[in-house]
Amino acid sequence: MNCCFLPIRWLAALLLLAGLSALPRPGHAQNPLLPGYFADPSIKKFGDKYYLYVTTDGYQPYGNLGLTFVWTSTNLSDWQPEVVEGLPYKSVWAPAVVQGRNNKYYLYCQSSVDYIGYVYVGDTPTGPFRKVNQLEGFDLEPFADPVSGKIYVVSASQEIFEMDNDPASPTYLTRISRRISVKGRFDFTEAPYLFYRKGLYYLLWAGGRCWQKSYNVRYATAKSLAGPFVDAPAPLLQNDEAHGVFGPGHNSVLEVDGRTFLLYHRQDAERAPTCGFRFTCASEVAFNPDGSLKLVRYVDDLGAALGHKSPYVNLALNKPVFANTEEATHRATQAADGRNDTRWTTGANEPGTLTIDLLREQAVKRVEVDFEYPDKLLTFKVEYSSDNLSWTTLADHSKEAIMACQARAVDRDFRARYVRLTVLNSEDRNASVWELRVLGTNPGR
C-alpha cells in the first residue's frame, strides 16, 4: 500500500522502539537461516565460531535419508555447510554436541531406525566421530550446568541424565551415572532443551505432533533440576499461518550480545502439515520481570538483527533472471530473491540454464550455488560474461558428477555483468536451486 505518511524505515524504527513485534507481512513465510530442508537445530559456539547442528530433511518418507551436516559461521549471517564425519549414513536424528573438560567433543543423537540415543566422541566439532555408547532415551541434548559445573543430557523420555563427569574416567560423558525424572505435568512430546538464567532452570520442548499444525514450543521452569517444573500457561511459539509459521518446534537457545534467540524448525508452507520438509528459523524472545518468556519477533536474518555485518553484499539480489525452463511454482526469479525457502526448479529430465543480469559490470569476489539437496550428485558449470556473448568458465563440473556441497562456493576475483549456471544432470534428473548468490565486497563493512 502507498497510503503511509512515514517512510517505511521510520515506521519500522518506531515499532521497534515501542517494543512491538516486527513480524513478516501476512502471507509471507518467515525466511529460514539456512538454504534447504534442515530440522532439529542445535547451536553451539566453540572458540570464535558458531556451529549449527541439524537433521538433514526433505527425503521421503521420513525426512532424513541424507548426510549429517553442521553449518558454521563467525558472524551469524554467512553460513557454510560441513559434513559431520563418522556418523551413520541416512539415519541420524537431532545431533547435538558439547565440549568436555578434556577438550574432546561429544555428540549425542538418535537413530531413526531403532529410536535409541547414542553418544560419539571426536577431536573437533565436525569429527570424525567414533561411536562410544548406546544411552537409550530420545532427542538427547547436552546441558552444561553453570551451577554445579556438571554436564547433563536431557531426554524426551522425560529424564535428565547426569553423565560421568570425571575427566580421568574412561567413560567420561559417555555413561549415565544418575537419572533424574523430570517432575511436572505438561504436554511433553519431544525435543527437550535446558538452559539456566538467574536462579531458574528453563526446560523447553516440542508439544503436539510434528506432522500436524499443533506442533509448538512450550517451556517450564524450576529452581533445581530435581524440579518440580512449572509449565507456562501458553506455548512460546505456535502455528501462525498469517505470518507463514507452520508447526514450529524442536528448538535450541542462542544468547548473544545480551539478547536471546530461539532456533527451531518450521514446516514448509507448500507442504504443511509435514514432518519431512522443514526449515531452520529464528525468533527473538525476552524475559519478563518474573522470569517468564515472551516472543518478541520472528527473525528473517539473524546476523542483521544483531547488527553483524557480512563482508559480502549479494549483487544478484532481485536482479533480472532468465532461464530456459522453469516450473510454474518454482520460477527463475526465485533463485535471486534472497529467500532460503523458494527455488528455481525445472521439469523432469530437463537440463537448466539460469542467467543473472547484474545490470552493469561489477567486481565479484565469490559465487555461491545452493542446490536443493546439498548431498546429492550433479553435473553443472558456472560461467561469467561482460556482454552475454563471450563466456569465461568459473567452475566446470560438467564431465564428472560432484556432490553439491563440495562445489557450493567459488572464491575468485573477476568483473562481469552476467553470471550463468548450467545444470546438465542430477540424481533427481532436473535442476533445482534455492539461491544463486553473486557476492561482492560490502562497502559498509
Where are these regions (language model features)?
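Non-cytosolic beta-sandwich-type ligand-binding/adhesion modules
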Residues: 73, 118-123, 214-224, 232, ...
